[in-house]
């Protein structure tokens, strides 16, 4: 899907599609080797993983592009809640967007409400909540209870939730990875896939372990 949907339209879309009981356990490969290795194989189902892009160009978009390709191959749906209007679909191949639901939120509270609805729906293997671009003062005003609610919903519905941020905001996240270094100029001459494969992340929270990767 190359066009975003608003909150109300998202509710109508989900209402027309029966909810599913997602598969429990296991993980979902992002396709970015360094990220998957740090997580013990991929994004764990039933958990919130926070991916911090500490500097511009440090690789957050590469991880998302790789995730879209990996889930497309595995025939898994992805939902993106875009809290700061940062998603640029024209930079992605059209075939990578066919399994993506893109929700453009008008505010952080609306973004959190969208994420809460989607994580409980069961039709999406991965929920990505992108809060990069939201000012730190706004994020810091977000009650801890809202993040805790998202974490509980992920656990109850076996959803893999990826929060993309610029600094640590999800205090209750079981997993936190940090992309610290922007890409060197020489790396920009490589393909997107090559740059994604070369990414490395610091594991700031969590305990890597081998998990079963789910496919179609």
Positions of PLM-derived features:
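Charged helix-capping and loop-helix junction motifs
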Residues: 141-149
């Amino acid at each position: 899907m190359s066009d975003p949907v608003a909150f109300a339209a998202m509710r109508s879309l989900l209402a027309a599609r029966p909810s599913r009981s997602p598969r429990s356990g296991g993980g979902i490969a992002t396709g970015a080797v360094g990220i998957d290795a740090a997580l013990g194989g991929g994004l764990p189902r039933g958990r919130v993983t926070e991916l911090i892009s500490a500097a511009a160009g440090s690789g957050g978009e590469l991880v998302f592009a790789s995730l879209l390709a990996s889930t497309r191959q595995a025939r898994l749906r992805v939902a993106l809640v875009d809290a700061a209007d940062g998603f640029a679909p024209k930079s992605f191949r059209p075939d990578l967007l066919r399994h993506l639901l893109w929700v453009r939120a008008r505010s952080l509270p609306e973004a959190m409400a969208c994420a809460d609805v989607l994580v409980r729906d069961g039709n999406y293997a991965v929920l990505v909540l992108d809060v990069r671009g939201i000012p730190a003062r706004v994020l810091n005003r977000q009650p801890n209870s809202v993040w805790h609610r998202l974490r509980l919903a992920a656990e109850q519905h076996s959803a893999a939730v990826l929060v993309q941020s610029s600094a640590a905001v999800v205090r209750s996240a079981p997993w936190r990875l940090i992309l610290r270094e922007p890409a060197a100029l020489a790396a920009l001459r490589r393909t997107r896939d090559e740059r994604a494969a070369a990414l490395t992340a610091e594991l700031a929270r969590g305990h890597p372990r081998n998990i079963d990767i789910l496919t179609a």
